[in-house]
């Protein structure tokens, strides 16, 4: 299995280095749910600004403040502790008057707004995230500048970031041990993390192999293509390749790669043979996913950061802004720009 740092680059390995997350203010994330609170209902949506706090810690503190069980507070996604983040938490408080959440006090946190909502906020129920990153001590400005220009046109590999695999790859290692021993795993969180790491690693491997081809975005017979921004896909046939290639070039369609699991992967013929060959050596992880009935799915092979802009503060410091859809990783954008240094270079966003 290829480690994250050794995965194939779309724009070639960066020529320079830079410091990511010199301080939390250098990594700002604003969650975009894609909808507004209903204004009524048994739940309360709370938008919180956090600095130096992880999501679960804040959720538990909010539950304690509201005198409800911790399981009654949910969120759409985990956000990094070592960053400045805005995100929504959701508390189920039925049949009660609206509490004064401006009185909620927690070091590093500030309540920005809150309102009633009809439905629970579930994991993954967000549109995306807006990022503002500051890269410092950049050693090669010209290389980073050209890469930013190229990313606007060609995007980046839609890899799952190193954080998906746990500190030091612990989640992937856990999945491998589980696959090899067949010992039941009772802990629901471990099961979820390990299965997710296994499937993500196989996806990354398939994409890394595809990126070694001369024309990465060339549609081949049997490719599974996805309408940009949609979840469903269809299979490309030889007769349609020219027309479909035009739509891929226009970014109307996206070539996808497999998230292996039980059931059909989605590709056929030449494309399916390629994907199967790319992960042929990873029989244990594939068997684990089938055994645990993790359903196969698809994910876009490339990621196009939206609203991408940048501003050089000086020759060694650049501020970069962009928006990514839910499930995408900012660190997978950064790895195409610089070789990152710093204690938190691979920590989750």
From Swiss-Prot:
GO terms for cellular component: cytosol. One of its GO terms (molecular function) is RNA binding. Transmembrane segments: none annotated. Substrate binds at residues 27, 129, 329. It comes from the Bacteria. InterPro entries: PsdUridine_synth_cat_dom_sf (IPR020103), PsdUridine_synth_TruD (IPR001656), PsdUridine_synth_TruD_CS (IPR020119), PsdUridine_synth_TruD_insert (IPR011760), TruD_catalytic (IPR042214), TruD_insert_sf (IPR043165), TruD_pseudoU_synthase (IPR050170). Keywords: Isomerase, tRNA processing. It catalyses: uridine(13) in tRNA = pseudouridine(13) in tRNA. Its EC number is 5.4.99.27. GO terms for biological process: tRNA pseudouridine synthesis. It holds the Pfam family TruD. Residues 155-303 form the TRUD domain. The keyword tRNA processing applies. The active site is at 80 (nucleophile). The keyword S-adenosyl-L-methionine does not apply. Responsible for synthesis of pseudouridine from uracil-13 in transfer RNAs. Belongs to the pseudouridine synthase TruD family. This is tRNA pseudouridine synthase D. It comes from Shigella boydii serotype 4 (strain Sb227).
